[in-house]
UniProtKB/Swiss-Prot annotation:
Similarity comment text for this entry: Belongs to the KRE9/KNH1 family.
GO BP field: (1->6)-beta-D-glucan biosynthetic process; (1->6)-beta-D-glucan metabolic process; cell wall biogenesis; fungal-type cell wall organization
Pfam families hit by this protein: Kre9_KNH1_C
Official protein name in the record: Cell wall synthesis protein KRE9
Origin organism lineage: Eukaryota, Fungi, Dikarya, Ascomycota, Saccharomycotina
Domain of life: Eukaryota
UniProt keyword list: Cell wall, Cell wall biogenesis/degradation, Glycoprotein, Secreted, Signal
PANTHER family tied to this protein: CELL WALL SYNTHESIS PROTEIN KNH1-RELATED
Segment forming the signal sequence: 1-16
Main localization of the protein described in the UniProt heading: secreted
GO CC, one annotated term: extracellular region
PTM section of the record: O-glycosylated.
């Protein structure tokens, strides 16, 4: 019954800002045929602006850390709502085609830019995907960087005389308890930069415990749709150990012949004369 209520509430959402559902994390797309096609799908997430206000979309192929987004393919073709497919469940879809010569193989994500005339824009990102059999140039960072979560959405929308700017500043949300966040997509708490000394003498709970709320009637919207788990926001330093290796036990007097510890002498047994 609870599952049914959740499903019904999802379909009862008002038409609103972008919530990407495809591609999924780690999905692989091949450019062996000269073109790689990424199927993009998104639904309404209950936040402003309504999707019927979106004038056009722009799609870009990007890579790199969440704090250093680099878009390597940014076609300026404006995709209008008439260019999109929409099924009966309210899922929008678009096939984003990219020539395999644009970039080399590696880990990428797609940036979805939605423009609302006279009000502003929103930015959303797909989970990280893998492009294989690509024939374009590559970089060391593209080949080596990996992560599990996409960049967080950004919103800059003017409603009336106010500007509604919801840009996820990682440095600010890391310290905000999960239960105090109010956006549709929340950020899970992560480890902070450790100090150089341990000063605590007792333990204490850093964040409140979680809870679940059951509803007796169907809701027309959801308080939250997704949770992001950011990458580390701290660094771990390392150095080369230049200390001279210790001598082997046989060289520093710590080794001894085990025969000196024997209290009984050994003798050879002939197994042919052993009885069971």
């Amino acid at each position: 019954m609870l599952l049914l209520a959740i499903l019904l509430s999802l379909f009862a959402l008002i038409r609103a800002d972008v919530n990407i559902v495809e591609p999924g994390p780690g999905d692989t797309f091949s450019g062996a045929d000269g073109t790689v096609s990424i199927n993009l799908k998104w639904v309404d997430n209950g936040a402003y602006p309504p999707l019927d206000k979106v004038a056009y979309y722009l799609f870009s192929l990007c890579y790199g850390p969440n704090t250093k987004i680099q878009c390597v393919y940014k076609p300026d073709t404006k995709i209008t709502p008439d260019d999109l497919d929409k099924d009966d469940a309210g899922t929008y879809s678009y096939k984003f085609d990219i020539q395999s010569s644009v970039v080399g193989s590696g880990q990428f994500y797609v940036q979805v830019f939605a423009w609302v005339d006279g009000q502003g824009y929103t930015l959303h990102y797909t989970p990280r995907i893998e492009l294989t059999n690509m024939g374009g140039p590559t970089t060391f960072e593209l080949l080596t960087y990996t992560d599990t979560i996409q960049p967080v959405p950004q919103t800059s929308i003017r409603t009336g005389t106010d500007t509604n700017t919801q840009s996820f500043d990682a440095s600010s949300v890391y310290s905000l308890p999960y239960t105090e966040q109010t956006l549709k997509t929340r950020v899970a708490p992560i480890q902070q930069q450790p100090g150089t000394k341990v000063t605590a003498t007792t333990w204490s709970r850093r964040y409140p415990t979680s809870a679940v709320t059951f509803y007796s009637t169907f809701r027309s919207s959801l308080d939250q749709l997704s949770t992001l788990t950011p990458a580390w926001n701290y660094t771990v330093s390392s150095a080369v150990n230049y200390a001279t290796p210790a001598a082997m036990p046989s060289d520093n007097g710590g080794w001894y012949n085990p025969i000196k510890r024997q209290s009984l002498s050994t003798r050879k047994l002939n197994v042919r004369y052993l009885s069971s």
